[in-house]
Amino acid sequence: MDKERILTPAVVFSVALLHLAMVALLWQAHKLPVIESGNVIEFVDLGDFGGGDGAPEGAGAPAAPEPQPEPEPPKPVEPPKPVLKPVLRKRRMRIFSSLRKSRNLKKSRNPKKNRNQSLSRKRSLSRNRRKNRSRKPSEKPAEHPSNASAKADSEQGNGEETGTKRDGTGRGEAAVNVSVGVKGEHGEGAGSSKGNPLRANGSIPRPAYPTLSMENDEQGTVVLSVLVSPGGHVESVKIVKSSGFSRLDNAARKAAQNGHFQANAWTEFKVPVKFELN
């Protein structure tokens, strides 16, 4: 019973709220529209009533005058070119043509001499070709005689030797002459005597003639000092006398470093290398 008493007022209250909401909705639907009042502005064209200066209606401002084109500046007058060079050229051409004609006449007058000269040139070229073919491509090193006599003092260790020279040819028309001589011991220890002569020999490969030296006609003789240890190993190469051209000196030095020597003691070889063009 208590529960029913509590529910009845709540139901009544909710039903009342629903009726109020329905009434409010119906009231808003039947409302009349409210007309809003505002200021109205009208625009009037004053040009239809004529201008203030007495001109007819629609007459505007006067048109601006058209700009006149500027006159073109006068072209500079070119001075006349002098006519002197063609005359000089004609004279020169005439002189050269006359000289050529005179030379051709001289050559035609002596046909036998011209033929002889051409034949001699052909013969010289054929001889040079035969010489180049006869030369072997592999260059042999210059040999030194095995018996090189040495005379030295027992206290100082200085000696004098003699070596033979052999001519050789290089590449093409170049010739390189190499000869090897023995100077004696380096100065360490006792020197040799007549009863115990120093025996040493050696050879170096023929150095290649530098191409730039051949083109510039560089010739000369290089004297090298080659120090050889016991066993034939080249220890150092020095230039005693230069040829005057660094390329020739370097070529001779490289060839001496690759030389083959036979020595029982420290031996200094003097190697002259001659570069010449045939």
UniProtKB/Swiss-Prot annotation:
Membrane topology, record value: Single-pass membrane protein
Residues on Cytoplasmic side: 1-5
Major place of residence: membrane
Biased composition (Pro residues): 64-83
PROSITE patterns assigned: TONB_CTD
This protein's GO CC annotations: plasma membrane protein complex
GO BP terms: protein transport; transmembrane transport
Bilayer-crossing regions: 6-27
Keywords per UniProt: Cell inner membrane, Cell membrane, Membrane, Protein transport, Signal-anchor, Transmembrane, Transmembrane helix, Transport, Virulence
Pfam families (alphabetical): TonB_C
Gene3D superfamilies: 3.30.1150.10
GO molecular function: energy transducer activity
Positions on the Periplasmic side per record topology: 28-278
Domain TonB C-terminal: from-to ranges: 194-278
Compartment annotation: Cell inner membrane
Stretches with biased composition (Basic residues): 87-135
Transmembrane helix as UniProt keyword: yes
Disordered, as annotated region: 51-203
Subunit text: The accessory proteins ExbB and ExbD seem to form a complex with TonB.
Family classification: Belongs to the TonB family.
Job description of the protein: Interacts with outer membrane receptor proteins that carry out high-affinity binding and energy dependent uptake into the periplasmic space of specific substrates. It could act to transduce energy from the cytoplasmic membrane to specific energy-requiring processes in the outer membrane, resulting in the release into the periplasm of ligands bound by these outer membrane proteins. Required for heme utilization and virulence.
Protein name, as recorded: Protein TonB
Native source organism of the sequence: Neisseria meningitidis serogroup C
